């Protein structure tokens, strides 16, 4: 841990407060984040938690050491949506083969897309199909403890039975009673349920559907419910390797540090995960800190296919930001667009709703262009340590205050503190060494452009604008355009201040 590292504080959805982060074991910091269901291309809303928790992963590695942090992000490859996509896309193949084609191709695309967004690979990415044994064992334990029951070849969890026991209460994360949750939720009404709020841990597979040997003495093949998958995978990757699990009766060993995901997962998914894990493992908390990122809109509207504003990560990467022109192979172009998308996302605090706009994406690309131009001009190399990233680290240690971190990067750029800029960008996942060191990147071929002189003229123009001397402001703009430098004016959405960016044209 760096000697000068500030105290990391994170907002905990469970307590509704910002808390000092104290890992269970500083040598084994553990985080689990709900990953994709691999049946279709991931959309930009899916990108947000990937980016947010990648920044946290980087920060934890910076504070505690890379070898002391384990980050698990699951892959859901058992789901009714996968079955439906397989039947639609591969009707002539055996069903299991069709499912494998859907999950393998979709997962490969997801991995390529999130890598282009500048994300590190998680330490482990467990797949649901690889952890059926753990799911069955947890379900058997829940039945034995009287909080789950068998009905018509289903196994169901009973929240009311959980709340009749001593220990954690169902509804603590969502801060709602059973009656309130029932009134506000869409629940499956089924004759085999004892109570409407009971949820499925295991269900029978229909003919032709994928199936596995069932728990709880059920003779037919079946498959797991969504919620038990994450309980089992987090146990397998974050508890059992560190002495916890079903064979452990030490509650502290059966908890990990951080669980993350989108705000839409608070109920029912995360509430149900907590119920399953706490009852099976005998602990008060599945994870000590629960973190959730806010919703995403597109150009001020909810993203939906019916509105025609449904944007995948791949759409963003294919957008063709102007800096690269027609140059570059697809991988390089993806990486540049991915960095711009990452910076655009991080300009909004992770807990706040975000409005995705094409203008913000373009402005982010312009800003990165200027930052990388300075790094190249000053011969910045890939940093081995991040000893000059203290301002960015301090901002991120305040509940991942990415806006304050970006403000620190802008200040470093303004005063030409190359070490602080480059290392701060690295800590946020915004530094791609290729764009710093490659000699053939055309967007940085600006030997005849004096960036500092342009910045001075932009500042002079801003003074004229503030003085309402429009003629002189226009004169500077027109002179720069004649020299091949085009100015673009916009407003900072947070402060309302004018932002002027520039690009070489012609």
Swiss-Prot record:
Gene3D superfamilies the record matches: Cysteine-tRNA ligase, C-terminal anti-codon recognition domain, HUPs
Compartment annotation: Cytoplasm
Cofactor note: Binds 1 zinc ion per subunit.
Required co-factors: Zn(2+)
Short sequence motif named 'KMSKS' region, residue ranges: 302-306
Enzyme's top EC category: ligase
Name of the molecule in the record: Cysteine--tRNA ligase
Organism name: Brucella canis (strain ATCC 23365 / NCTC 10854 / RM-666)
Lineage, opening ranks: Bacteria, Pseudomonadati, Pseudomonadota, Alphaproteobacteria, Hyphomicrobiales
Gene encoding the protein: cysS
């Amino acid at each position: 841990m760096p000697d000068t590292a500030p105290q990391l504080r994170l907002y905990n959805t469970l307590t509704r407060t910002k808390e000092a982060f104290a890992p269970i074991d500083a040598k084994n910091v553990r985080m689990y984040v709900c990953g994709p269901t691999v049946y279709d291309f991931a959309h930009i809303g899916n990108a947000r938690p990937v980016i947010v928790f990648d920044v946290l992963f980087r920060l934890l590695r910076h504070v505690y050491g890379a070898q002391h942090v384990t980050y698990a992000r699951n892959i859901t490859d058992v789901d009714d949506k996968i079955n439906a996509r397989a039947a639609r896309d591969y009707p002539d193949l055996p069903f299991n083969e069709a499912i494998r084609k859907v999950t393998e191709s979709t997962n490969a695309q997801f991995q390529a897309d999130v890598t282009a967004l500048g994300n590190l690979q998680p330490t482990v990415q467990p797949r649901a199909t690889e952890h059926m044994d753990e799911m069955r064992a947890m379900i058997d334990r829940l039945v034995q403890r009287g909080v789950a029951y068998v009905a018509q070849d289903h196994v169901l969890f009973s929240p009311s039975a959980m709340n009749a026991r001593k220990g954690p209460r169902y509804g603590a994360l969502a801060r709602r009673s059973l009656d309130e949750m029932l009134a506000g939720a869409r629940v499956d009404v089924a004759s085999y349920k004892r109570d409407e709020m009971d949820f499925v841990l295991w269900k029978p597979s229909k003919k032709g559907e994928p199936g596995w040997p069932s728990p709880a003495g059920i003779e037919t093949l079946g498959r797991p419910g969504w919620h038990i998958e994450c309980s089992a995978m987090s146990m397998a990757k974050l508890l059992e390797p560190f002495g916890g699990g079903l064979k452990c009766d030490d509650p502290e060993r059966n908890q990990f540090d951080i669980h993350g995901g989108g705000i839409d997962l608070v109920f029912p998914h995360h509430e149900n995960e907590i119920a399953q894990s706490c009852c099976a493992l005998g602990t008060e908390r599945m994870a000590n800190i629960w973190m959730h990122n806010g919703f995403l809109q597109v150009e001020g509207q909810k993203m939906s296919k019916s509105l025609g504003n449904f944007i995948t990560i791949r759409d963003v990467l294919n957008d063709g930001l102007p800096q690269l022109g027609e140059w570059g192979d697809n991988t390089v172009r993806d990486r540049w667009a991915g960095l711009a998308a990452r910076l655009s996302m991080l300009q909004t605090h992770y807990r706040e709703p975000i409005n995705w706009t094409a203008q913000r994406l373009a402005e982010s690309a312009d800003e990165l262009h200027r930052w990388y131009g300075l790094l190249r001009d000053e011969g910045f190399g890939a940093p081995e340590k991040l000893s000059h990233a203290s301002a960015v680290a301090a901002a991120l240690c305040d509940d991942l205050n990415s806006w304050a971190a970006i403000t620190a990067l802008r200040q470093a750029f303004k005063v030409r503190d190359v070490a602080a800029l480059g290392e701060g960008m690295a800590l946020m996942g915004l530094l791609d060494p290729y764009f710093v060191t490659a000699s053939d990147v055309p967007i940085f071929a600006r030997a005849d452009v004096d960036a500092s002189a342009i910045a001075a003229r932009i500042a002079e123009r801003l003074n004229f604008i503030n003085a309402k001397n429009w003629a002189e402001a226009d004169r500077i703009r027109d002179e720069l355009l004649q020299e091949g430098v085009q100015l673009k004016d916009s407003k900072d959405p947070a402060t309302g201040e004018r932002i002027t960016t520039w690009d070489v044209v012609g």
